[in-house]
Amino acid sequence: MKFTSLFFLALSPLAVRVLADTVAFDQTYDVGSNSLNIVSCSNGDNGLEVFGFTDFASLPGFPLIGAAGAIEGFNSVNCGTCWELTFVNSKGTSKSINILGIDHAGAGTFNIALEAMNTLTNIQAVQLGRVNVTSKQVAASVCGLNI
């Protein structure tokens, strides 16, 4: 028994962390002409403007963008991280999308573009409001960010 426990403890750093979180929409992220200057990941050493992005529409994968709890605030080292969000509907059908993190959200939450949430929930974002999801961080390149 002790050997089994030690084996799993040894493997735990290699495991991908899957978290239970919630997602809601914020239509601010649907407006392609919105400047990056209104989000936490604008400028600074970890900001997205240093890579030539200027507004939401210039970001790869727009409108699959939003705020993530992992982004602590302005100039976070987690700016530009990519998150796979998986929603399971009432019939047990799951759907996943990848979201580029560009702004701060509360711990355990994501706030994403309405269009992105409609993709995730089969056009039920407004009806559902906030939903439970599982999230896991994936390579930024999955969201089209190759920096």
Which residues does each PLM region occupy?
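Secreted/periplasmic proteins
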Residues: 12, 16-115, 119-147
